[in-house]
Amino acid sequence: MPNGTLIWHSGSTCNVCFEDDSRNGALLWVDGQTGDHGILASGVRNSFDGVWVDSMGYLFTDNGRDWEGNHPPEEVNLLVPGADYGWPNDEPDDPVPSGTIGPIAKWAPHTSMNGIDVRPENSSLPGLSISTGHTVYASVYGSWNTLLPQGHEIVRIDFTPAFDEAGNFSGWDSDETRIATQLGTPLPLRFSPSGDLYYATFGGGGTLNRFVQI
């Protein structure tokens, strides 16, 4: 975080359950100097990565429960300190239970959206200008319990500000686009200071790759 606070993404111990330790299935804040820590957000089943986006805040991925068909979608969420993001109470007929916060972007269920990073202005890869919105890129590891294989890709997500009828800011609209497919099992993903995008894969002994637009 800009103030130096570390964020620890703590996964759940189960597919669907109420955790005995509330630090599981949550985002934790950590003081890097003292080691003090606490719960920053709950209801987050399995968040792999997050990134700070100026004028938006902290975005983080979250992978929902398995073995429930086309539910729930993989998520990108905007951090609100103290908020509950729904797991394990989210259901197909009630995807955003009362008192919880829904995602600001979604992707195919059970595909494991993992790494995420904000596209810098100096990148040659496509994206919005800072005057119109923000673009992040995310890695999608790939499905393992769907009928047909999905994922194994890099996704571009554009966020643009939304306004109500009175012209007041009301949130963020998102637009998701596949940028590259058949990438194996991508996990971490980062833009370099020069604007190049790098990602690493898990399978096949692991590889580090630079993503280039042709």
Give the location of each predicted region.
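Generic C-terminus detector
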Residues: 184-214
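Nucleotide donor/acceptor-binding cores
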Residues: 4, 134, 184
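Short coil/turn segments at the loop-to-beta-strand junctions that recur within blades
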Residues: 44-48, 182-186
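Beta-propeller domain segments
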Residues: 12-18, 22-39, 45-177, 194, ...
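Short amphipathic alpha-helices and their capping/turn segments at secondary-structure boundaries
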Residues: 2-3, 76
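Asp-box/WD-like beta-propeller blade repeats and closely related beta-sheet repeat scaffolds
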Residues: 1-2, 9
